[in-house]
Amino acid sequence: MLSVDGAVLLLWPKDLPAHGALFWLLIAGLPNAVFVALVALNRADYESRHLRVLYYNDHRERRRMELVEEGQQSLKVFGYAYRLPLECGTFAQTVAKGMSLLKAQPLRDGTTIVRHLLLPEDDESDVVDPRLRQVLAQSSLTREGKLYAQLLAPLLDIIDGLAVSGVLPAVRLMVDDDVPPGQALQQIRVVLGAFHLPALECRVIPGCDGLMPVDAWLDAKETRPLLLMAAALHDVPPAESTEGGVAILLAPETLRLPSELVSCATIHRPVSRPADEFGEGVALSLLWGKAAPSSVERAWVTGFAEDQHALIGVACRRTGLERLTTHESRFNQDRVVGHAGNAAGWLAVTAAAEYGGERPQLILNRARTMQAAIVRAHPPRKS
């Protein structure tokens, strides 16, 4: 204010007397006007910055909620089938018992002895389904083709129900890098034709993707059902491995299906992380699965080497999954039947659906990366 008064005095004309209304208006009023203007400008700047931050935070929060809502999308499991060299009982019951079925036995050529499990080659005579028996009799089918047929047969009624409602599933075959994709596609098309199914879109995806085809299917916003099939057959089986296969039929939650088609489980969006970020991946899978850490009592584990199980314990402690820090709460199917290659992760999903229970279950799969997903089994429909 003194600087404004000084400027008025310096600029006041010398030939005018320094008094009067104009003089005192400038001396007393101009500094106050300048002060009010500066305060108003400062306040306007503060308000604009405050509103900018407020709207930015509001937009960021809305965007975060949109991303969380998108991340929490899931696929329903409408059916599954698996083929494994089990002695008796279901796969989930066998793994839950914890008794290893692995045994040292010679390879098919008799060259050496390896601890592993093999699918029987002469089990076609035990087939009850006449349609499946007719398909298996076709000479153009390889071992992979016959396994695809055995996996597909239990799902035929569901696929027929989808076809009647005008919804056809897309078929995705999970194959290893050393398997020619053209051969796998040719075999599944022969099987589909032999079962007289409509022409289904069939593609091959890398077996090392593990559970992540669910993530890709959700990102693509597909409205079709998804039929995933994986087979693990060996000419020279690795130690601690098993032959087998799995097929699982998934569909988006938004897909309207006939009332007679009832889902048996839900798989939430899986998360893939490297080993040093595994804890973050487990935490994110809980968020995507809308599961509180205290509600998860069981985990199905596959693909982890013996020295990597410590990572599971560390990740569980960091995310509040105290119940899963003990081996008793983690079902390790590899120790019971051996590792099933690219089918292992999906066998864990079917085991969780088959085991049932009201609480969410955690799937931990070691493929190309470490993967985690939440599976919720649905209670059977009352008749």
Label the predicted regions.
Residues M229-H234:
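Generic short beta-strand segments
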Residues S241:
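Carbohydrate-active enzyme catalytic cores, enriched for enzymes
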Residues M1-P213, W217-A220, V236-P237, V246-S383:
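Conserved "HGTGT" condensation-loop signature of ketosynthase/thiolase-family condensing enzymes
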Residues P225-L227:
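Short, well-structured beta-strand segments enriched in hydrophobic/aromatic residues
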